[in-house]
Amino acid sequence: MIQPFVSVIVPVFNDSERLKKCLSALEKQTYPQQLYEVIVVDNGSDEEQDTKGVVNQFSQAIVVYESRPGAYVARNKAISVAKGDVIAFTDADCIPATDWIEKGVANLLSVPNCGLVAGQIKYFFKEPDKPTTVEFYDSLMGIAQKRFIALNYGATANVFTFKSVIDQVGNFDETLKSSGDSEWGKRVFAAGYEQIYADDTCVAHPARSSYAQINKQMRRITGGWHDMRKKEGYSGFGLVKDIVTLDLKPPVKTIFRLFVGQQIFPWAEGSAKGIPQKLEFLYVMVFIRAVVISERVRLYMGGDSKRA
């Protein structure tokens, strides 16, 4: 079987240190070097980040620039210059396994009419054997690709597709600062393409370790939800319904599993240890719901959604 040329797309915004680790991993791929390129899209990083200087250290990578804010705008810029028949997406804070491209391409080619492969995202902690409760929560609730595929999309931290699929269904929605991968993936599904989860196509991702990071993430995600709902005619009734049925609904089953020591979420293995961790885990859940409610209200009152 002829191996296709692959364009790997990596958007970055003020994250040059982690970008360096990502590019180092992409430089060491088992896939033939003459058959892939890495396109880094700088999305308006501060000058001292020196994205170009970082990219120039790696022979497989080039850098392009997109001044309009938003990771999906940046990805579209890279798509416009990509040479590959296969397009692979990851993020600057991810560390792909050495066989990531090889496995992603193999999975994409193995399924007839495949339009999207969502690979595994493994979380790692600052102290591998002693994750904080916030890190532990993020590792369970984070980017659950197997669950996302059941909802007809994959997170662009680890996605493979064909350029021909993008040509047919269109680029990412540039009005969205979050959840654009969900919106795009559902277009791929609606066009009749197969979508698969690939456990062996793996990138590592750092778990968020602080309440500030979780706060920022949830405000960004809530903004993405809001922007998509606004396109559908989001009303005050819809806002109240979301708050009452989603944010204020007690997670009784989750709390029960948490305190009896069972697996907390059906899609991710893991149980809390000891009363202090269980109580803080519960606090994280309450904290996130409070953040989401406040952001829903802020956005409905005319606030702008936030970028990454």
What are these regions (language model features)?
Residues 1-28:
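N-proximal low-complexity "stem/linker" segments adjacent to membrane-targeting elements
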Residues 87:
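Short aromatic/hydrophobic "clamp" motif used to bind/position activated sugar donors
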Residues 219-223, 237-308:
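Non-catalytic, C-terminal membrane-associated alpha-helical segments of glycosyltransferases
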Residues 49-52, 66-82:
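Glycine-rich, basic loop-to-helix element that forms the pyrophosphate-binding segment
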Residues 178-184:
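Acidic donor-binding loop at a coil-to-helix junction in glycosyltransferase catalytic cores
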Residues 119-120, 134-151:
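Short, flexible, basic/aromatic active-site loop/helix in glycosyltransferases
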Residues 23-65:
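Acidic donor-binding segment of Leloir-type glycosyltransferases
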Residues 99-131:
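Conserved donor NDP-sugar-binding/catalytic core segment of glycosyltransferases
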